[in-house]
Amino acid sequence: MHVTVDDPAFEQLIDPLVKIRSTMDQHSSAIDQATLARFITEGFFLSHLKQMRRLYAERREFFIKEFNKLLSDRFILQIPEAGLNFVAWLRCEADFARVARVRAEIGIKPSPLSFYCIQAKLKPAFVFGFAAWTPAQIRESLVKLASALK
């Protein structure tokens, strides 16, 4: 449905759209804003960023090492300069359906790269995240996936 300003239906849409926008665009409370401002001005935000960068760098390196040790026979891990995800390209395209089925069966959730594409036809790959997981959880998941794919 396409409605223009000249359309009589336009007037009927104003109130519902205003309500939707006011619900969607609610701002943080003054106390939340003041707390965040203090968090930033007193240096806690910078400290937090440094801590998280260090943590994510450790997890990133751990993921790369473990992934390559356990799964390099099935995947080529693309290592970006930055970010919290990796793309793992299947060495054998015919394995895509099996890997997709196995990951669902064992509860590991790398997304197929195709989920992020509208029209592009890419070679089969999966997107793995690492930031939310401890090294022990990363190892456990990768071992589980490698074992299930043998």
Regions found by a protein language model. Give the residues of each.
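PLP-dependent class I/II
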Residues: 1-150
